[in-house]
């Protein structure tokens, strides 16, 4: 299997003991717009900005990202999957995916500690 490419927004994770690539592609984001009942990407970003997320939202995001990464799964499959690190690992993975999609410069910096961090 190919390695994840952070420049394309891909994230690598161990799920059900297998290394998988996840990516919130445009198709995955369109899928999430429908799932969350919003009309555009800006509304989707606003929806995620408050940092509150239920389990069903995480399933939708992880499912869309798995499919965006080329994995043949549906949300029913995702419900039963085990992310390395348990629920905490799933929360971190979801946050990384959203960061890669909506703030790619931060994900690249986090993945590469040698890259200078922007001042806040």
Label every PLM stretch briefly.
Residues 26-43:
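Short, surface-exposed, low-complexity cationic segments
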Residues 24-27, 53-57:
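Generic recognition of short, well-ordered alpha-helical interface segments
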Residues 1-14, 39-51, 68-120:
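Charged interaction scaffolds used for protein-protein
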Residues 57-68, 96:
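Short, hydrophobic/amphipathic alpha-helical patches that form generic packing surfaces
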